[in-house]
Amino acid sequence: MDFFNVVDIDAAIHFFKQYNVRKAAIFGSYARGDDHLNSDIDMIITFTEKYDLLDIIGLKQDLESVFKRPVDLLTYESLRDDSFAANILAEAKLVYEKN
């Protein structure tokens, strides 16, 4: 299923701007195109400003209300230099970048 046909991307962009997200990408089943009806949405983000756990939780909850499915959020800063991070970055598809 195409990610952009499933979600209201304009509503998501509203929240990306509200939370000062600099870049957001999907990875996992939606990025690979092998998602199913019960798939969650895996996203990796980075912020333009300092952020805390409450920002991540708030953004996660707001995105789940838009996408109507669970969202797993990672930050680029939290990735370590290992094969897991390399796999995420290799399959990531950009969905938002602040101008």
Residue ranges and their predicted role:
Residues 1-23, 31-37, 48-99:
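Catalytic core of pol beta-like nucleotidyltransferases
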